[in-house]
Amino acid sequence: MAQINVIGQNGGRSIDLDLPEVNPHVLHEVVTWQLAGRRRGTASTKTRAEVSRSGKKMYSQKGTGNARHGDRSVPTFVGGGVAFGPKPRSYSYTLPRKVRQLGLAMALADRQQQGKLTAVDGFGLDGKTKSFVSWAKENGLDGSERVLIVTDDELTRRAARNVAWATVLPVAGLNVYDILRHERLVIDAVALEPAQELETVPAEGNVQEGAAL
């Protein structure tokens, strides 16, 4: 059972979380699944049927002394079609829900074991970048590490979004990949209450989201 101290306006308490042992293989599975879902999959090449070439035979089959050829759209000629080239497709695949939940719990456990997880109940910010920087310094965040801020508080999100070393996500956007690519995790205490039910889910485009069920 991991005990996480809560700071902030309503801090002074702790949250007990039943976090699993970290298994790098599970984390790798979840991150690979997340990144596969983000791939655009728009690479496309033309086959010999799609290139702009005449379908007429280049020259007679016999009598010229040249090698036998049909039309110029074959892959052996410059400007011809591509054999077995890429076509638009989806790289996403399914990953069991329990594995996704376990991966997120392990990512939280990893940051907790390293002492890089901070729970906050009440940031008390006014939406100004200056107030966030001041709050960060008071709590040991000096910009030397990349920080992931997870909160639904609009004023906090507004205050932190222009800070170069901070990334802001809503609670619903909590995911394994973003946790692992930031050195520190600052999370709203509310998001940790149902931590055993958190789940990383795929998202479209370049944003990956999670869901607390």
Swiss-Prot record:
One of its GO terms (biological process) is translation. The gene is rplD. One of the primary rRNA binding proteins, this protein initially binds near the 5'-end of the 23S rRNA. It is important during the early stages of 50S assembly. It makes multiple contacts with different domains of the 23S rRNA in the assembled 50S subunit and ribosome. This is Large ribosomal subunit protein uL4. InterPro entries: Ribosomal_uL4 (IPR002136), Ribosomal_uL4-like (IPR013005), Ribosomal_uL4_dom_sf (IPR023574). Residues 41-75 are annotated as: Disordered. GO terms for molecular function: rRNA binding; structural constituent of ribosome. Belongs to the universal ribosomal protein uL4 family. The keyword Hydrolase does not apply. SUPFAM superfamilies: Ribosomal protein L4. Part of the 50S ribosomal subunit. It comes from Deinococcus geothermalis (strain DSM 11300 / CIP 105573 / AG-3a). GO terms for cellular component: ribonucleoprotein complex; ribosome.
